[in-house]
Amino acid sequence: MISQTLISTDHYLSYAWRCCLFSGKRNAVFPSLEMANHQLCEPYLSHLIVDMETLTTSRLEALETLRQPNLCNRGLHIYLLASKDDPAQMSFLRAAGPFHVIARDLSVVPFRQALLVPPERSIHAPLFPATEWKILSSLARGLTMKRIARQLNLPYHRVVYRLNTQLRLLGLPDRQSLIHLLHRLTLNRHHQTL
């Protein structure tokens, strides 16, 4: 029975995971969330670590998968490894769900410690509610604010208000910054290296 699963295509990280960090533990490494799908609903899986920098799908698609209630509501600790060089992305990942976000470039000892002793999520930590998540994912797909308001059956000014609230929580200066962030989150690794 696998209790810890790492999703990564980084061979160095996968090797370190198996041989140095948690050797002898019941762990597995998969190159994608799709390939690990059969493991994700197992009741004995306690830790899911997703390397957001090496995903073969977009980060936003991965977050959609990880936000599913069957994963979030059963006590599974979900860790997202991300580059600390992009603070806006780190804030977005923290707000996207009940995830523990860890800087990807930590050395071995702090990295292992972060996984062994998960931090308690602050009661005041902002999470995107379902409606705000729909607004953000619709914006990422290129829909206009008016169209989003129609789809959600909300007045336009309510959509603008909700979006501005999320901008403040993320510490972004304006909507254009959010659009750029969402664009980066919709790119997969192949598009980022072109």
Predicted regions and their residues:
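Regulatory hinge/linker segments at domain boundaries
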Residues: 116-137
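Short alpha-helical "packing" element that flanks the helix-turn-helix/winged-helix DNA-binding module
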Residues: 132-139, 166, 178
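Short helix-to-turn junction characteristic of helix-turn-helix DNA-binding domains
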Residues: 139-143, 182
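Recognition helix of helix-turn-helix DNA-binding domains
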Residues: 144-177
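Basic, Lys/Arg-enriched C-terminal extension of HTH/homeodomain DNA-binding domains
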Residues: 167-194
